[in-house]
UniProtKB/Swiss-Prot annotation:
Organism: Bacillus thuringiensis subsp. konkukian (strain 97-27)
UniProt-recorded Gene Ontology molecular function terms: ferrochelatase activity; metal ion binding
A biological-process GO annotation: heme biosynthetic process
Gene: cpfC2
Protein name: Coproporphyrin III ferrochelatase 2
Family as reported in the entry's similarity comment: Belongs to the ferrochelatase family.
Coiled-coil segments on the chain, per record: none
One CC-aspect GO term: cytoplasm
Pathway noted in the entry: Porphyrin-containing compound metabolism; protoheme biosynthesis
Residues the record lists as binding Fe-coproporphyrin III: 13, 30, 46-47, 54, 125
First-listed, main subcellular location of the protein, grouped into a coarse class: cytoplasm
EC number(s) recorded for this UniProt protein: 4.99.1.9
Subcellular location: Cytoplasm
Alphabetized UniProt keyword annotations: Cytoplasm, Heme biosynthesis, Iron, Lyase, Metal-binding, Porphyrin biosynthesis
Functional note: Involved in coproporphyrin-dependent heme b biosynthesis. Catalyzes the insertion of ferrous iron into coproporphyrin III to form Fe-coproporphyrin III.
Amino acid sequence: MKKKKIGLLVMAYGTPDSLDEVEAYYTHIRHGRKPSEEALQDLIGRYKAIGGISPLAKITKEQAHKLTDSMNNMFTEYEFNCYLGLKHTAPFIEDAVEEMKRDGIEQAISIVLAPHYSTFSIKAYNERAIRLSEEIGGPVIEPIDQWYDEPKFISYWADQIKETFTKIEDNEKAVVIFSAHSLPEKIIAAGDPYVEQLQYTADLIAAAANIQNYTIGWQSAGNTSDSWIGPDVQDLTRDLFEEHRYESFIYCPVGFVAEHLEVLYDNDYECKVVTDELNAAYFRPTMPNAQSTFIDCLATIVSRKMKEIVDKELILNNN
């Protein structure tokens, strides 16, 4: 019996593959407006500081393909085909949807490699994909909107924190800062659940790791005229030190799923500069990347959506 093909659309932010691509990438982020030479060189300098280019592109591809392999192992009666769609670099989200159409994919599941829902991220990704699929007559895309409370995601970070605390002598003088990418404050006024979801993720992880000293912060805010969600993790670090005299800071950027510029520079460089100034210890647990435990987490999320689709089809076929 021929297996039914299912498209697995894995979406992520994207990153330049080389320093030569940084300007085009930055221009795309700015909706077609080229950055100033000063802003461009600042961004290039950040990439150089982490070794020349971000590992994100390689990690994202590995995550997508390993997830697809896991799905094929879990659902042997179906054939999952991997399609990678990126927000700001090729292959763009639209490229992936068009490729699915050319390949004859009639049904697809989409997942964004970001756990927390916001109109700026997950909603925007899925809308781009679904809008084009409707325009070109398929495939039908079943989106996964959020997975910030997935137990295996919570367990991953709780385990990382527990391991980190084994390296700290005085746990009562340590604090965990859970962070995500800052977004414009106007999303809060519009009822976006992004902030509440990060707090809930932090509460779940803290409970699972049995830690008392923790808070949430925001990082990597854009350089625009908008007000962005705060406090920024660097300011937060200084405030926490002044108030509690913490000796160890553990940064958990749970809004991200891989090592990339925002983690390797904004956390590992900029936050460490602050902890060094305060003569405090800096810790940042290992990111999920393409570790088997995290791939299993993603597969659990996608398989739940797949079972919903299968159950829906059974109901329709029995009517």
